[in-house]
UniProtKB/Swiss-Prot annotation:
The keyword Kinase does not apply. Zn(2+) binds at C458, H461, C484, C508. It is found in: Nucleus. It comes from Schizosaccharomyces pombe (strain 972 / ATCC 24843). Keywords: DNA damage, DNA repair, Hydrolase, Magnesium, Metal-binding, Nucleus, Zinc, Zinc-finger. InterPro entries: AP_endonuc_1, AP_endonuclease_F1_BS, AP_endonuclease_F1_CS, Endo/exonu/phosph_ase_sf, Endo/exonuclease/phosphatase, Znf_GRF. Mg(2+) 2 binds at D191, N193. Coiled coil: none annotated. Residues 348-392 are annotated as: Disordered. PANTHER family: AP ENDONUCLEASE (PTHR22748), DNA-(APURINIC OR APYRIMIDINIC SITE) ENDONUCLEASE 2 (PTHR22748:SF4). This is DNA-(apurinic or apyrimidinic site) endonuclease 2. One of its GO terms (cellular component) is nucleus. SUPFAM superfamilies: DNase I-like.
Length: 523
């Protein structure tokens, strides 16, 4: 059984990449990845506009949570292969505050057979709503274990520090209560958005920043405390246990700086599990070769059999999926086939043809002695309301009047040109020469204004630079700048040594603000 996690950076995004742009559905992607249970993060869509082709995948049950306020943001989903397992329970959110789909009560108020339970304690309703308003967590109960899929908030400095603290605290407490009070096995997958150790990043300045920025130190300490063998640890980092010393095991890269070709990334996507599931683990790894996002998939494989016991016997195979499943969502229920759709269309067309037209209604009212009254608000009449013959005559009259107007304008223009020529004939040749010269100079000036400048060349390779914009909040937000266009990686020792043979494929140190470059180019 393969449990796979992938931050897709937009549910439609993978289909922009090869080979997925040759595929028609997520079913084909899942088959290619050999995945049975898939957790996707960063859906970046709203519940009301989520396309059916992504909500319903043949052979899979699906479960989604979406942000409640902010649009085109966050979102987590699960796809579960029906012939592998069907969970007995499913919840969205961590705190239990969200309503059960189709019911008038929340998960915390639901009957025992519907809720997974063991919610965080001592959280007021306002904070609970705040934590679960962004569509960041889903829990599925497979009897043998509870599978948690998360998209944790990114560390963006002090801006959302309080939200991150509340989210991390609630998530840890939920996991801890499920393990210690519920005696449950746990698997947690997803984009945790925190690197754990120096081996998990190519940029060692990340480790230096940790000692300088308290919010970074705090978030990394959270995941270190969550993981065993920490004294406070609850879960094992299965991916790292399988590959304890492997370097370059990164799952996320900066696409704007094109760092993936040089594998200059970080490891922030995880497959975590309680120690009692370790005997069932067959493998855990990343799929760095799989394109489709700024993240790559990570997976955890469970053995089909252990000590003569079959995995399938321990997994749930419910007759009906939980209420969170899209199978219970009326918008995605296959109630009509295409034949019935065309029948409905033909009946509508027949009714329209049998109904009197607007012109017939007007004629009838006129013959009865009453004149029709049309308000200004309703003065725009549908073209289809005219009979075909009348509509053709009306369109022809419009076209004739249009061309007649064009002809008049053309004649008027010709008259103006004749006058201009007569005036020029009265001027001497020197005046004409000066006029033409001035026009040419003006034209060249406008060309210089509107023509694109060639980008500056980087000092390390003498190659055209890349143009970027500062997106990080601060005093430089929105400023434009130029940097070396090569992928980020090991920096060349002497960025000005252009005479040396260029054996270094990585980005040099060149940087210039666009405003400075434009000012210098004028000198």
């Amino acid at each position: 059984m393969r449990i796979l996690s992938w931050n897709v950076n937009g549910i439609q995004n993978p289909f922009n990449y090869f080979p997925w742009n040759k595929k028609n559905s997520y079913k084909e992607i899942f088959q290619e990845l050999q995945a049975d249970v898939i957790c996707v993060q960063e859906l970046k869509m709203q519940k009301d506009s989520f396309p059916q082709q992504y909500a319903v995948v043949e052979g899979f049950d699906s479960y989604f949570t979406f942000p409640k306020i902010r649009k085109g943001y966050s979102g987590v989903g699960f796809y579960v292969k029906k012939d592998v397992a069907i969970p007995v329970k499913a919840e969205e959110g961590i705190t239990g505050i969200l309503p059960v789909r189709g019911q008038k009560y929340s998960y915390s108020e639901a009957p025992e057979h519907e809720k997974i339970g063991f919610f965080p304690k001592d959280i007021d309703r306002k904070t609970a709503n705040w934590i679960d308003s962004e569509g960041r967590c889903i829990l599925l109960d497979f009897q043998m274990f509870i599978l948690i899929g998360v998209y944790c908030p990114v560390n963006s400095g002090e801006n959302r520090l309080e939200y991150r603290r509340a989210f991390y605290k609630a998530l840890r407490e939920r996991i801890e209560r499920l393990i210690k009070e519920g005696n449950r096995k746990i698997i947690l997958v997803g984009d945790v958005n925190i690197l754990c150790n120096p081996i998990d990043t190519a940029d060692q300045k990340d480790i230096i920043r940790e000692s300088l920025i308290p919010s970074i130190m705090e978030s990394r300490q959270w995941i270190r405390d969550l993981l065993l063998p920490s004294r406070l640890g609850l879960l094992l980092d299965i991916g790292r246990i399988q590959h304890p010393t492997r370097k370059g095991m990164f799952t996320c890269w900066n696409t704007r700086l094109n760092t993936r070709p040089t594998n200059y990334g970080t490891r922030i996507d995880y497959t975590l599990a309680t120690p009692d599931l370790l005997p069932w683990v067959q493998d855990a790894d990343i799929m760095a070769e799989v394109m489709g996002s700024d993240h790559c998939p990570v997976y955890l494989d469970l053995k089909e059999e252990y000590e003569g016991k079959k995995l399938s016997n321990f997994l749930s195979h419910s007759k009906e999926p939980p209420l969170l499943s899209t199978a219970h969502h009326s918008a995605y229920r296959p109630s009509k086939n295409i034949h019935s759709m065309f029948q409905h269309f033909n009946s509508m067309k027949k009714n329209k043809n049998n109904s009197p037209t607007q012109s017939e209604n007007v004629s009838a009212s006129a013959s009865s002695g009453s004149s029709p009254t049309v308000s200004r608000a309703n003065s725009v009449i549908d073209v289809d309301a005219y009979p075909p013959e009348k509509r053709r005559r009306k369109e022809q009259s419009k076209l004739l009047s249009f061309f007649a107007k064009q002809k008049e304008e053309k004649e008027e223009t010709n008259k103006t040109e004749d006058v201009s020529i007569e005036v020029l004939d009265n001027n001497n040749e020197s005046d004409i020469g000066l006029t033409v010269k001035k026009k040419v100079e003006n034209g060249n000036a406008w060309k210089q204004i509107f023509s694109e400048r060639a980008p500056p060349l980087c000092e390390g390779h003498k190659e055209p630079c890349k143009y970027l914009t500062v997106r990080k909040p601060g005093i430089n937000y929105g400023r434009k700048f130029w940097i070396c266009a090569r992928p980020v990686g090991e920096l060349i020792k002497n960025s000005n040594a252009v005479s040396e043979e260029d054996t270094q494929p990585f980005q040099c140190r060149f940087f210039i603000w666009d405003s400075d470059w434009r000012a210098n180019s004028k000198d």
